[in-house]
Design a protein with these regions (language model features):
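Extreme N-terminal, non-catalytic leader segments
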Residues: 62-122
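Aromatic pocket-lining residues of Rossmann-like dinucleotide-binding sites
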Residues: 140
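Short secondary-structure boundary/capping elements
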Residues: 60, 108, 257-260
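Long, basic/Gly/Ser/Thr-rich N-terminal segments
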Residues: 1-85, 291-305
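Conserved lysine of the Walker
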Residues: 133
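Post-Walker A alpha-helix
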Residues: 136-137
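Short Pro/Gly-enriched beta-strand edge/turn motifs at strand-loop
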Residues: 52, 95-99, 200
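Glycine-rich, often acidic-flanked micro-motifs
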Residues: 2-15, 114, 118-128, 143-305
């Protein structure tokens, strides 16, 4: 598949072909508590995601939404919507979370963020959910820049450094960002049942880069919405630790996997400039933020503003 996950192959980069098989809805069979190796909770305290072993594969369950089975090598994903749910829920969960987790099992480095093309290079924005990374990256399309990927930035080592690889050509935005950044004729995917975020497909004003681009900068977004615009270099542990927090990892209980991630991130920190980016979360300020980032990519010694 090119833009939409379906019962076909999904491009996962030049070295990996990730297969998603979307099946008909089925009842979610009980998973014994003893089989659950990890769970995350929703804001109301209810289970949001359960991870359990299913033979050599791994089952990821979103209660009342969908089940995903990731193969032992991370190259195949089977998905079953829960009854009375919509396939788009599976698609959005696959794009935003499952795809990156499967790629991590296949040995790839995937960071929780978005990436955009600036000239011939890529810059990546990393943040927690709701931290503004998709909004910031999408806003660059206002100036004619192409998006590379939303939600999960897959990186590949090269002799010259790291490459940011293109992903699925769609992006997800909350309603307030949609009102500011989305053209009326943009193509929107069907609604997902679990979120008010809408998913917009590539095309029109949202042009996606379909080739790997050298990674020039990584910006870790600060979480203070009132902060003044600033760009501060990070190095060593100050860069490594937040990158580790933003790394997708399915097999987090595997010591070899943890060691592999640390090696890859250490190499990334050595070869790629990492910065903390603070800026006021105001749509009116975004043009100045974009210009500061463009100038910083051209001349990292120049102060923002």
């Amino acid at each position: 598949m090119a833009d939409e996950p379906s019962q076909s192959s999904a491009p996962a980069g030049p070295t990996t072909l990730l297969e998603l098989k979307l099946h008909s809805a089925r009842e979610q069979r009980p998973v014994p508590d003893s089989a659950v190796i990890h769970q995350t909770l929703a804001a109301d305290g209810s289970p949001w995601m359960l991870i359990s072993k299913d033979g050599p594969a791994t089952l990821i369950r979103y209660p009342d939404l969908a089940d995903f089975l990731i193969s032992a090598d991370g190259l195949e994903v089977d998905a079953w919507p829960a009854p009375d749910n919509v396939p788009e829920s599976c698609k959005q969960l696959f794009i935003s979370q499952i795809r990156s987790l499967a790629l991590s099992r296949a040995g790839h480095l995937v960071l929780h963020g978005s990436a955009v093309e600036l000239g011939e290079v890529a810059v990546a924005f990393l943040a927690n959910s709701g931290g503004g990374k998709s909004t910031l990256a999408t806003s660059f399309t206002k100036d004619g820049h192409r998006l590379i990927v939303d939600d999960g930035v897959q990186l590949e080592s090269s002799p010259e450094g790291y490459l940011a690889l293109p992903g699925i050509a769609s992006l997800r935005l909350w309603e307030d960002s949609e009102a500011e950044l989305v053209a009326a004729d943009s193509q929107v995917a069907p609604a997902a049942g679990y979120t008010s975020k809408r998913r917009f497909l590539g095309g029109g004003s949202f042009v996606f880069c379909d080739q790997p681009r050298p990674l020039a900068r990584i910006y870790l977004l600060g979480d203070d919405p009132e902060a003044a615009l600033s760009i501060v270099p990070l190095a060593g542990h100050a860069a490594l630790l937040p990158l580790l927090e933003h790394t997708f990892t399915l097999d987090f209980d595997d010591r070899d996997v943890r060691a592999r991630n640390l090696r890859m991130l250490a190499q990334l920190v050595t070869n790629t400039p990492i910065y903390r980016l603070d800026f006021p979360r105001s749509y009116a300020e975004l043009p100045d933020v974009r210009e500061a980032i463009r100038q910083h990519v051209l001349d990292p010694t120049r102060p923002p503003g």
